[in-house]
């Protein structure tokens, strides 16, 4: 028996042992428990959400009692909406009531209707059982699933007992989904999402709710868990654009400390929504997210940055992920109604400015998300498709000078990021632009200045910050040899002084090393790489490009 067979048999035995523990029930040796324990067994240690506390809960405050009475009065309104769903499913009244709060005993049926789980069950009869059995036999992530289940909502009465009924149902859902969607397979966040569904839905309904949540374009949640998801990049770019517009100082500090590239606030936000705040606020935010869709993510992120503006400006590069998570958790450590009130106001503001969703990708981009185009250092971040036009060149580079080199045919080309092409030789002519070759008429006709609006269109999807490129490999692959001003002025001067041109051509080379030093330094400077985007033969007057590129 070779090593592969031994490893395969060991994994199979490990998988069977884990499944057997869940099949036996609570504590993997006691008789199988029939469900969650009743409320009276916890001696008034359970709140209205099902969270078990270590000490006995104090009596209800006036605010909590008012909230319970309010939920009871709202129940009849939600029942009426469910009875006439075709009328209310796209109405403003549904959104208004979702922000005010969804009653707990209505949340399960409402989630099922929003995610259309009944239709999925009718279209796929018996498929969940098949996927579940296949997952038990061939799961590759069962150890990770078992480890994550042990830490999922353990303070809730449904998931308090190890290997209990709800933990077994959660295992079945995750195994079935791993088999159902191999592209996503299993991720850590799926355990918390499925556990939230199990609080209010049966096992099979919770499975199809998870399927619909990740598959629907309305919520775009699969991009956070799939390696091929392109929507998440568009949401991340839009989030950076929104935060840079509303909180420029905060975003400027994040860029200065290079924190945005190390941790994604949007990805952190998804984890916070799953298992980082109080369960009551988590459920209310999920209610809004299921009703509004992906456009609710931008307002939530904007509120988090706005509330934590002072703390985020003091965030250093040391441990940015932990600091970000702590700041976001502190953001939601406040009254639920207050958070939802600010969320609704932010939602209306971003919708009015059309900043709640990223701009649609162009057809040639396919599924890839649009990248933001930096206008200038310290300015606004523009995205493709924005109504605002990108700014013009800075004043100190009013007009570039075309190279005076004779026309040459390109020998080879090398593709560069963003669609640009680097050519080994530098052709003078370009389509749509007159050739700037030296005029034969007179010395003054040797110069051809090109205005900015007549320049060839440069790639705008490059991730460039200022005159310097951040990525070393990209900078190495897109060197542009800049022609010095002396070389550009030499043909003009020779045209005006033909005698000096003949004298310099027949002059003997100097043997003095000191006299040749400036020319050698100049040649070395010309051969040295210069910064800037690949311009495909277009040479500027200076070796540094304007900060607006």
UniProtKB/Swiss-Prot annotation:
UniProt function note: Acts as a GTPase activating protein for RAB5. Does not act on RAB4 or RAB11.
Domain Rab-GAP TBC intervals: 101-293
The UniProt record lists the keyword Ubl conjugation: yes
Biased composition annotated in UniProt, kind: Low complexity: 398-417
Miscellaneous notes: TBC1D3 is encoded by a collection of very similar paralogs with multiple copies of each paralog, some human genomes encoding well over 50 copies depending on ethnic origin of the donor.
Gene3D superfamilies in the record: putative rabgap domain of human tbc1 domain family member 14 like domains, Ypt/Rab-GAP domain of gyp1p, domain 1, Ypt/Rab-GAP domain of gyp1p, domain 3
Known tissue expression: Expressed in heart.
A GO MF term: GTPase activator activity
Keyword flag rRNA-binding: no
Protein name from the UniProt record: TBC1 domain family member 3H
Major site of localization recorded for this protein: membrane
Locations listed in the record: Cell membrane
Name of a matching Pfam family: RabGAP-TBC
Residue positions bearing lipid (S-palmitoyl cysteine): 318, 325
């Amino acid at each position: 028996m070779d090593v592969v067979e031994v490893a395969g048999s060991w994994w199979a035995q490990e998988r069977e042992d884990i499944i057997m523990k869940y099949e036996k029930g609570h504590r993997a040796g006691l008789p199988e428990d029939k469900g969650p324990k009743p409320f009276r067994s916890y001696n008034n240690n359970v709140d209205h959400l099902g969270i078990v506390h270590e000490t006995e809960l104090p009596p209800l405050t006036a605010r909590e009692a008012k909230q319970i009475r309010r939920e009871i009065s709202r129940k009849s309104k939600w029942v009426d909406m469910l009875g006439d769903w075709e009328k209310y499913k796209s109405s403003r009244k549904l959104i208004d009531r979702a922000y005010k709060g969804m009653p707990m005993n209505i949340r399960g049926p409402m989630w099922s209707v929003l995610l259309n789980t009944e239709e999925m069950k009718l279209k796929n009869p018996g498929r969940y059982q098949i996927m579940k059995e296949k997952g038990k036999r061939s799961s590759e992530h069962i150890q990770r699933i078992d480890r994550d289940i042990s830490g999922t909502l353990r303070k809730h009465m449904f998931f308090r007992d190890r290997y209990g009924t709800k933990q077994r149902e959660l295992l079945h859902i995750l195994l079935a989904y791993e088999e159902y969607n191999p592209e996503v397979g299993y991720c850590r966040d799926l355990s918390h999402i499925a556990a939230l569904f199990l609080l209010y839905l049966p096992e099979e309904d919770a499975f199809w709710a998870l399927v619909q949540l990740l598959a629907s374009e309305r919520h775009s949640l699969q991009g956070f868990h799939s390696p091929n998801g392109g929507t998440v990049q568009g949401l991340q770019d839009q989030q950076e654009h929104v935060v840079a517009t509303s909180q420029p100082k905060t975003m400027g500090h994040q860029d200065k400390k290079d924190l945005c590239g190390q941790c994604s606030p949007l990805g952190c936000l998804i984890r916070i929504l799953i298992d980082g705040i109080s369960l009551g606020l988590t459920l209310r935010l999920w209610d809004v997210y299921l009703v509004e869709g992906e456009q609710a993510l931008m307002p939530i992120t904007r509120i988090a940055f706005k509330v934590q503006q002072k703390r985020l400006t003091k965030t250093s590069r040391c441990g940015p992920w932990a600091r970000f998570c702590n700041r976001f958790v502190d953001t939601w450590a406040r009254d639920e109604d207050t958070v939802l009130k600010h969320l609704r106001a932010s939602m209306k503001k971003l919708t009015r400015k059309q900043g709640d969703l990223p701009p649609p990708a162009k057809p040639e981009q396919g599924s890839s998300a649009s990248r933001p185009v930096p206008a200038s250092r310290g300015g606004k971040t523009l995205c493709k498709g924005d109504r605002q036009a990108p700014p013009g060149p800075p004043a100190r580079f009013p007009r570039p000078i075309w190279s005076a080199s004779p026309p040459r045919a390109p020998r080879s080309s090398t593709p560069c990021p963003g669609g640009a092409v680097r050519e080994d030789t530098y052709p003078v002519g370009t389509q749509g632009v007159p050739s700037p070759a030296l005029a034969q008429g007179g010395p003054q006709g040797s110069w051809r200045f090109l205005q900015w609006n007549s320049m060839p269109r440069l790639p705008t999807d490059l991730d460039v910050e200022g005159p310097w490129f951040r990525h070393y490999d990209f900078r190495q692959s897109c060197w542009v040899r800049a022609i010095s001003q002396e070389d550009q002025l030499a043909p003009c001067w020779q045209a005006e002084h033909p005698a000096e041109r003949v004298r310099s051509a027949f002059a003997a080379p100097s043997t003095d090393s000191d006299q040749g030093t400036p020319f050698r330094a100049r040649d070395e400077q010309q051969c040295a790489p210069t910064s800037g985007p690949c311009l495909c033969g277009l040479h500027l007057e200076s070796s540094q490009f304007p900060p607006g590129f």
